[in-house]
């Protein structure tokens, strides 16, 4: 009986396998019939090129020769007075050789070895013209005296710097070759879409030149705040592997066009985790053209010092939200001064473009032709004003970022002589000749000064000169206390101090709650 049950189970399993095999066979036939087509949900069949479906080899092969490794040359004996020690430390095998050769009475000439140039990898780049013009990142070649270029065939050249632009992190180099060089062309990054395939070629970790990786465009228009100096706010994000050393290398689309300059990665560990960023070609190309023509990029300015709004600052000024930028200083006889901009004004619109923060304003100004007149919309004492202003060529606006929140308990400790007062662990004093000399405060400056900070971390600094509180000028600490107590009675959270620190000014909120 048991044997009969086992027999029946085997028969059922065999029958099921036959059915499954038949279904799989039918499925394979469907795939064969579809050939190079697939159907997306709710879409028509899409064609996929044979080359891209099975391999990127045909796409990549002609591109690799146009991608270069960038390095600099360093000599050990240029590094320090302890050249011999440094040399043995960096090349531990020399220590072993020295011992062996010493036993054989053969001298090891470390001085000659130290004269041997050592290549220090910097990053990647790509050739954009047969005459040897090369695009890379500014941060790759910044502060480097000798720039060495190695081609895919290991041919090496010394490059000269044609021009650079730290604001967009781009640089243009040139090498001189007797033969025309392979090159690549920029494509239109505006045509690229999220989900498109992209290919990155570069020199990761400085010794893996010609490395090819692929991925898709994960997002566009990313503002990643690479640093406060950078004005690019529309990075392309990709999951193609980008590592240290890939900086300055090209990002290609499947049409073999450069649609981005690989620039940065997001990684807590400093290695690729699938989040890389590239400067779009439509941002890079006009900058490169200006570097080719002039060797630099000139931009306009307003002649004001600006800072981002915070909730604390907005609350004091009676402004809703944090969109806009706060003017903390106006350069005398500058464009802003001539237009009538004042300290404490909030810039909310530049022409027909809304101003979200300091970086956005800098980007807008960078896009504005020099000497063009625009309408600037500002808020002053809760009223909107429109001021015409002409953008002139010079350095960019000074940005202040010392607007961190300060929420310390308030301690009032007025001294008997009424020369100083302590609030939030910060001691303020009337400005005396002794303090003016100690903190190098010019004679034409008035205000109260910070003489002590009783906390480890503070946005304030010793010697900070407070010239205004809210909209009022101040030159006596008694006024600080009056304004402070009035703010508490009105149930305000902060008062706003205008600090002069060296050549710049910044608004910093002081908590009263």
Swiss-Prot record:
Keywords: Hydrolase, Periplasm, Protease, Repeat, Serine protease, Signal, Stress response. SMART domains: PDZ (SM00228). GO terms for molecular function: serine-type endopeptidase activity. The keyword Transmembrane does not apply. The gene is htrA. The keyword Repeat applies. PROSITE patterns: PDZ. This is Probable periplasmic serine endoprotease DegP-like. The active site is at residues 139, 169, 247.
């Amino acid at each position: 009986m048991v044997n009969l049950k086992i027999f029946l189970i085997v028969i059922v399993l065999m029958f099921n396998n036959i059915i499954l095999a038949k279904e799989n066979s039918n499925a394979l036939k469907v795939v064969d019939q579809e050939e190079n087509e697939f159907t997306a949900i709710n879409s028509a069949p899409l064609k996929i090129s044979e080359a891209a479906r099975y391999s990127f080899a045909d796409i990549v092969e002609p591109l690799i020769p146009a991608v270069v490794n960038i390095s600099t040359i360093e000599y050990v004996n240029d590094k320090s007075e302890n050249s011999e020690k440094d040399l043995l430390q960096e090349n531990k095998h020399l220590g072993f050789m020295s011992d062996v050769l010493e036993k054989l009475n053969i001298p090891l000439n470390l001085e000659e070895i130290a004269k041997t140039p050592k290549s220090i990898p910097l990053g990647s780049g790509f050739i954009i013209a047969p005459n040897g013009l090369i695009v890379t990142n500014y941060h790759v070649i910044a502060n480097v005296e000798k720039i060495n270029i190695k081609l895919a065939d290991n041919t090496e050249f010394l490059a000269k710097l044609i021009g650079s632009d730290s604001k967009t992190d781009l640089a243009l180099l040139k090498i001189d070759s007797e033969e025309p060089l392979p090159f690549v062309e920029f494509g239109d990054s505006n045509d690229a879409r999220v989900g498109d395939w992209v290919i990155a070629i570069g020199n990761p970790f400085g010794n893996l030149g010609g490395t090819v990786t692929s991925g898709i465009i994960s997002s566009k228009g990313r503002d990643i705040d690479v640093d406060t100096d950078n004005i690019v706010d529309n990075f392309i994000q990709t999951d193609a592997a980008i590592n240290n050393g890939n900086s300055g290398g090209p990002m290609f689309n499947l049409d073999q066009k450069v649609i981005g300059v690989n620039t940065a990665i997001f990684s807590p560990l400093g290695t690729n985790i699938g989040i890389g960023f590239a400067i779009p070609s439509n941002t890079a190309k006009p900058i490169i053209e200006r570097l080719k023509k002039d060797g630099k990029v000139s931009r306009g300015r307003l002649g004001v010092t600006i800072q981002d709004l915070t909730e604390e600052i907005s609350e004091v000024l009676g402004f809703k939200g944090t969109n806009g930028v706060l003017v903390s200083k106006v350069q005398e006889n500058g464009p802003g001064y001539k237009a009538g901009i004042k300290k404490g004004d909030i810039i909310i619109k530049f022409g027909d473009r809304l101003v979200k923060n300091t970086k956005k304003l800098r980007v807008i100004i960078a896009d504005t032709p020099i000497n063009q007149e625009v309408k600037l919309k500002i808020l002053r004492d809760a009223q909107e004003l429109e001021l015409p202003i002409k953008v002139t060529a010079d350095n960019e606006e000074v940005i202040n970022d010392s607007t961190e929140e300060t929420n310390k308990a308030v301690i009032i400790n007025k001294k008997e002589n009424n020369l100083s007062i302590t609030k939030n662990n910060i001691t303020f004093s009337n400005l005396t000749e002794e303090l003016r000399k100690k903190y190098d405060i010019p004679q034409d400056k008035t205000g109260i000064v910070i003489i002590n900070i009783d906390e480890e971390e503070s946005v304030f600094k010793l010697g900070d000169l407070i010239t205004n509180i809210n909209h009022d000028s101040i030159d006596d600490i008694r006024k600080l206390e009056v304004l402070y107590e009035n703010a508490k009675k009105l149930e305000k959270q902060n008062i706003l101090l205008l600090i002069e620190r060296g050549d710049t000014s910044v608004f910093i909120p002081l908590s009263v709650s």
